[in-house]
Amino acid sequence: MIATFIISAVYASGAVNAPETFEQKIPNSLAKFEMARIPAGEGKQDGKSVPVKSLWIGRTEVTWDVYDIWAFRRDLDQDTVNRGHFDANARPSRPYGAADRGFGHAGYPALGMTARSADLFCKWLSEKTSKKYRLPTVVEWEYAARAGTAAPPAKLGDVAWYWDNADDKTWPVGKKPANAWGLFDTLGNTAEWAKLPDGNAVVCGGSFIDKAPEVGFGARKTPAPAWQQRDPQRPKSRWWLSDGPFVGFRVVCDD
């Protein structure tokens, strides 16, 4: 199914123009999400300027509405699932307990997935849509989150869900104002997977569990064993972070 291109009328206060966007529909489902065009420019890597090409990036974190289709095989008919006629290595096992931790589901950010899960979701999404979806690099993520500004938000609570205002849970995506390039929740809510030059992943931006000094464009966390401390499996799950409810992601689409 070909995505429908639209120009969004919703954008950050102070933005000069509404962002160029397209709506990506998931074939054979009602699920959809919006991507925004990010202009080419320069980002920072190890203190040095590096070029960033123009690309599309999710306006919000990936929500359960979309993630469920892949993670819980809702695009497969029951007979296919029962007979095991699918690549089980490319789909998650069931998590222990509620995947959404009881925070909320429809319209809420998917959370608690490993970087491997996020990568394989992007592969599935690419196959479903005939586009090239992937995780952003750390440079791309920060460049898009900053949206042309070097300064941190004047009032963090106006744009981010974090320790002081989140009530120890995630919130539906898109409830805070977007940045100048039309992106919501780049800071707070869930910290977002992004790739380092060596191919490993970190989470960026801070999350609902973090206090103000840990939420920002340069905030990074490296995966740690504590993120799976209560996982009863040996070895630990390749799919889920039993103690990482603060981890989510958004996707990038290359032209």
PLM region descriptions:
Residues A31-E42:
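Mature N-terminal segment immediately following signal peptide/propeptide cleavage
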